[in-house]
Amino acid sequence: FENNIEVINILRKNCLGICKNNQFKIYDEDLINSKLEIEFQNISVVYIDPPYAKYNLTNLLENLSSNIKNTTVIGLETGVKDNIVIPENLNLLQKKTYGKTIIYFFKLS
């Protein structure tokens, strides 16, 4: 999910470098305003990046975790000062800190 056309073009180019055209889909819309229960049942990877302060990341993770399949991986990029609560049904696979940024990877428990 992305609503910036320049970023969509970069994402498409990067995805084509690692998979075939029919193996990925980039949704041209805002994740928050999407129809989660419909879209996420077929998605294998979700990556959430800035602007983090614009949304309540805890609520976003809760909504995602109740609408994805067991094999979906969620990547979340936050600032080190951001305070998020990880839903109990998400298992932390990996956490990396890069300067002022933290990247998390989750899967359903």
Language-model features, listed with the residues they occupy:
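Class I S-adenosyl-L-methionine-dependent methyltransferase catalytic core
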Residues: 1-109
